[in-house]
A protein has these predicted regions:
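Glycine-rich, low-complexity intrinsically disordered segments
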Residues: 1-162
């Protein structure tokens, strides 16, 4: 017969991390225009080893998911201009020149902040680059929404420091 431990059955107080307490640092993009990020995670896949009429599975290569980033687009400093400056490191539309990955890949820091402003968790996104950008919609009928920019970022990998 199992004996229950009191720490397992009684509520233990804790302070949860909340979604709206974060600060992101991306070189060239002001932190205060970063509205949100989603999609941090990975997929390890699987490798199936067949043998006669049975099989065994082992993990495959770890592949980090793309992340979605949403920015506000203020008039000044222009969020669209900040994004396009990063895009121009990937590809210059006027000349057709592509950039080296050393120039356009960036390390991004996502600091999760506690209730008193202390950093309680830190993710570092290594080798981030822009895959897609959506500069939003302009519509005469909508007078209640701020303009947003949606980005999809590819990356090499992430590190959870603490």
């Amino acid at each position: 017969m199992a004996i229950l431990n009191s720490t397992e059955i009684f509520f233990t107080e804790f302070e949860p991390k909340v979604q709206n307490r974060f600060i992101m640092s991306i070189s060239g993009i002001p932190a205060y225009i970063i509205k949100g990020i989603s999609g941090l995670g990975f997929d390890q896949g699987e490798i199936i080893l067949n043998h006669i009429n049975v099989y065994r599975k082992i993990k495959g290569k770890l592949r980090w998911n793309d992340v979605s980033l949403t920015l506000f687009d203020p008039i000044t400093p222009s969020g669209a201009q900040a994004v396009m400056e990063w895009v121009r490191l990937h590809h210059e539309s006027v000349t057709g020149r592509d950039g080296y990955s050393d120039f356009y890949k960036k390390d991004i820091t996502l600091d999760v902040v506690g209730p008193v402003g202390d950093i309680v968790s830190e993710w570092v996104i290594k080798g981030a680059f822009i895959k897609t950008v959506d500069f939003g919609e302009y519509n005469w009928d909508n007078d209640t929404a701020a303009q947003n920019i949606a980005l999809t970022l590819g990356m090499d990998y992430c590190v959870l420091n603490f």
